[in-house]
Amino acid sequence: MDEIEKIALLRDELEALKLCDLDDLTQAEAGVKMGVSRGTIQRMLTIARKKVAKALSKGQAIVFE
């Protein structure tokens, strides 16, 4: 049986995704909550969203690191 490919989502990427997309915080608010800049949140969101989209479109598992 073939093993399902995995994509690793970092804890900070997951937290940024949760705060902005589920909790409806702005990137600036999420940055304050996480102790990072708005730009860092924006970067984490871009990376996380691409990883999730890739995993969903290719049937890959998402693992959290």
Identify the meaning behind each predicted range:
Residues 20-22:
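Short amphipathic helical patch at the helix-1/turn junction of helix-turn-helix
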Residues 44-47:
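Residues within the DNA-recognition helix of helix-turn-helix
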